[in-house]
Structures are given as C-alpha cells and as structure tokens.
C-alpha cells in the first residue's frame, strides 16, 4: 500500500533547480551522529508544488555516509522522502528511498542499492529519544532496509519536519 506513495526521482536536480519547483532549506545542514552510523547532511530541499507549511510534502536530503565511503561505495547520497498526513489515523506517514547523488538531473537511477523505508509515527507525540534511537516506536517493513545510514536520514528527517511545519496539521 505505501509502496505506491514512494516519490519518484525528479528530472531536475532539486538543489540546482532554476524553475522554482524546489526550495533549499538553508538552516538544515549538519552532522547527524549516532553510536552506530555518522552521516553529514549537506543540503535539504523541499518540493514547492504546495505551500511550504503543507502537511504533504517531498523532501530531498543530500548527505555523505562515512561508512559507505570507507567501503569504497558511493558516499554522496540523496534521500528522497515523502511526508503524508493521514487524517484517518491522525499521523504522518513517511516513505522514501535513497539514490546516488549522480542520479539527480537525469531521472534515472545510477545505483543498484535502493532503500525503501515505510514508517508512520505521530510526530507530535515523539520524544527526543524517538528521533535518535532508530527502530523503537516505528512500524514498518524493516526487511526491505539495505542501508542503515539511509534509515538514519529518514529518522532524522522527523526533526526537519518539526522545523519546517511546527504547527500541527
């Protein structure tokens, strides 16, 4: 059911788009570390097809994954994450995938490793520990996760959602 909601790879690079389709969020850059997997968020963009405070939105998070870099894999990644407000259950649903940064701008995946993350959580009831602890409190199909670093990007996107949309929907 949630698989059909996973965002597609955009034809434009969301961090370099000149069409005003994307908005780069200037203050959401930094290192996200966890005892397991450190990542560095380089840029965050939001698709502006709706109001910036809209409950439903698509985010693009460019990050580097130091663990992938040590194994010789492509460490310049983009998490493409869609936030959907489910009025029936009064929760945000978050679905997403990761791609190589090189994939952006041509609409084609250049990586064979894709991560599909399904989870839903009442963001207003989240505590700080929920945002940093990984799997606790999340519902989803974890067998589809192939990259823990990508999972952390999505988990930490919950913090970004609170910043971008502090008013409950």
From Swiss-Prot:
InterPro entries, A to Z: MS5
Protein origin, superkingdom: Eukaryota
Similarity comment: family membership: Belongs to the UPF0725 (EMB2204) family.
Designated name of the protein: UPF0725 protein At2g19200
Protein species of origin: Arabidopsis thaliana
């Amino acid at each position: 059911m949630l698989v059909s909601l996973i965002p597609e790879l955009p034809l434009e690079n969301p961090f370099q788009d000149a069409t005003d389709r994307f908005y780069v969020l200037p203050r959401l850059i930094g290192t996200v570390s966890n005892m397991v997997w450190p990542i560095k968020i380089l840029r965050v963009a939001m698709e502006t097809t709706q109001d910036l405070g809209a409950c439903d939105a698509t985010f693009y998070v460019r990050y580097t994954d130091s663990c992938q870099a040590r194994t010789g894999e492509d460490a310049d990644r983009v998490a493409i994450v869609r936030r959907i407000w489910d009025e029936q259950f009064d929760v945000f649903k978050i679905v997403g995938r990761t791609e190589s940064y090189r994939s952006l701008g041509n609409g084609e995946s250049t990586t064979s490793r894709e991560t599909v993350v399904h989870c839903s959580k009442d963001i207003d009831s989240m505590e700080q520990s929920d945002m940093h602890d990984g799997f606790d409190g999340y519902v989803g199909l974890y067998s589809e996760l192939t990259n823990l670093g990508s999972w952390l990007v999505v988990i930490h996107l919950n913090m970004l959602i609170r910043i971008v949309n502090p008013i409950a929907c």
